[in-house]
Amino acid sequence: MTSQKTTAAQQKAAKAKYKGKNSRSSKSGRWLWFAVGMGGIAIVSGIAGALLAVSWESTPLQQAQLSPQEEAVFDGDRISGNGLQFSQLTRPVNILLLGMSVLPPDVQNAPPESKNLRYQPQINSFEGLSDVMLLIKFDPETKKIVLLSVPRDTRTEIEGHGLKKINAANVEGGPALTAKTVSNLLGGVGIDRYIRINVLGVSKLIEALGGVNVYVPKDMKYRDDSQHLYINLKAGQQHLSGEQALQLLRYRHDELGDIGRIQRQQMVLRALIEQTLNPTTLAQVPKILNVVKENIDTNLSVEELVALVGFGSRTNRSNMQMLMVPGRFSETHEFDASYWVPEKRAINKLMSQYFGLEAKTEAQSSVPGRLRVAIQDSTGSDRSQLRPLIKTLEKAGYTNIFISKPWGQPLDVTHIVAQAGDGDSAESVRSLLGFGEVRVESTGNISSDITIQVGKDWFQNQAVFQNSTRP
């Protein structure tokens, strides 16, 4: 497939292709951070009322004051239609979403109520470190939404400040420098708009949505008196309040650190997508908008918000793809701090496949023998029960197979996870097996290319595999 490089300059050419076109009526998806699952008429009336009938072209939620040079970092041209088509997304658009964790020492003028305390509370600001970083592509042509998680500890060049962890870019230069840093890391991808939401806003947002039903993979306990951060969650499927969900999102004290946290974030995002299919979410519009007003900073205009939410509200969950910047943990004593070291070649491949950038190297097909395939059992079965599955894979040329630790959540349907973003190879595995569901997300074994999370449907097919692998 011929790809087009969507640098900031070339996005202008790309959007000319889409300008003036109506979005197709079958566009699918759901936009998490604002009002996933909202119907068009309810969104328009709700936003117009909550934002006090401001001009559709204004940016009433923007709290940062950007200089002309900083504004130029973002492609400011239209992303929505004209006239009656204002709620339609007219071209692919990349949004940089930053989740902020801000403590009083991070700001020049901390709120009076945060002073003279014996701990450092989270405050309603956007000046601190980026705790969560996502590049989200809304694409009306493919009818897909792609979320790319950028680990906060990624080692990269921050213009004017040297090699640092990427989460420091916001402290050094706000959303514009962060966008420029992310773009440089990801091969020059154009970034159209930004959104910053702080920790206080995330908790309130999930609470306004009614909480979330999610599987907590293990008991989580953590205590930090200096911030009054207390995490106490039990393993298992359960309903979490906004505050409890925030605990799950922030927990990073396990063997995978920030990468494990990204995996849990993707699990929560997936759960929210499925949960908000319920039309009763419409009743939560006022609460959600209040959260947006108080805890959001974005250069999106009102009509752009409507267009994005309108597109998102019609996206099928199967068209939501969740990726992570490829890389590795730094070795002990390799650097002065621990980092996620990005892998440039893998990044180039991923950006070409999912964000339309020009491939810098010739694309190579994924040969089965080169793919690292992890198997995670969710059924609690004896490992010997997986032998027919492994033999079938080996017979088809998948020779680099390993058993990973079990997947804690019991699954009815096997998940074939494209851990490294190689959806085509995951589809090939699914076709070989004849059962399971492909998921493009980063919740599998981080050392794998493909992770097979075995569900109960394996038992329905096990006899067939046993017969086919007998000599």
Task: Provide a role label for each language-model segment.
Residues 2-471:
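Non-catalytic, solvent-exposed segments at the cell envelope interface
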